[in-house]
Amino acid sequence: LTLKSTDSFLLSHAYYFLTFFLNKNGAEKTMKKTQTGIAALGILLAFGAQAAAPDWSKVAKRDIQVFHAGVTPIEWLMNKQEHSGRTGISKGESCAGCHEEKGTLNLDFKRLASKELEPVAAPKTMKFPVAMQAAYDAENLYIRLSFKSPSDAGAGADKEDKAPLNEVKAAIMFAGPKVGMGPQVGCWQTCHSDVRSMPGADPKKKKYVKDANVAGGNYYDYIQWKSGEAGAGATQVDGHVAAERVNKGGQALTKAEGECKAGLCTVTFTRKLSGGEGDLALAEGQVIPFGIAIHADKTVHRFHHVSLGYTLGLGAAADIKASK
């Protein structure tokens, strides 16, 4: 990312403004006035930094298919009797490496929609593409997701029951460096057979990572945008999943904003490379495993569409290579 001409204009004028202000008032003037000048410079600098956001028309897109996974937690994934691909995973193969083919997924969607793997009711739209774009600079990672949100959730699917009834939610999970098989399975290490909305599970038990350790890197960092209702009340979440899902505490997500018109949604995340507890520290040259989840038609819990596991590279070769 580079500064635009408008950014240079703002920064240069901010500099001359502060110089003039301090010279005019002299060293004998009050500290209060000096601080006012510095604050004004800070405002202009912040404005200039915002103007340096990516020109998305110049950032490459990559379609990632998200799908309704039904009742297929990590325990199912690693059960050879249920999932023949367990052997490949055990050998180091990724789910995407096996199931992504010519831009789509070769999954058995008839089985995924059956009572065996979706005992409640499957949505009519079992999969759809999400166009992902990514860019970064010295301070931030920028991600944009574009997709057409379906409105045909299965009858009986868990839905929002408290205002605002979020029509759409879009989330990205980043796997910590010590998550087992993180680069292979995406966010599946947070999905277990005993979490809420799974058959017979505790309705209060949230997503978790087995043997989680935030300091040790065995956890997921995640960011989410929630649409609110009728274009109002949108919110954002900066949390993580360790011993349980925590929807607060993150300090890296600067802004999540989105818009849905006639079902066409565009969601943009601005995330600092550094952050607080639960925020993965990112740097140029790094490759981060991730997964995408979209809740459409006011659904909650496991009634979402999710991606397989992919990798994001900050200037490094990966499934998605973020532009600098």
Label every model-predicted segment.
Residues 52-82, 162-165, 169-228, 276-324:
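Acidic/polar low-complexity flexible segments
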Residues 1, 8-30:
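Short, Lys/Arg-enriched N-terminal segments with co-localized hydrophobic residues
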Residues 140-147, 265-271:
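Short, well-ordered beta-strand segments enriched in hydrophobic/aromatic residues
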Residues 92-102, 191:
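The canonical Cys-X-X-Cys-His
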Residues 30-38:
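Bacterial N-terminal signal peptides that target proteins for export
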Residues 205-260:
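Long, low-complexity, polar/charged, intrinsically disordered or flexibly structured peripheral segments
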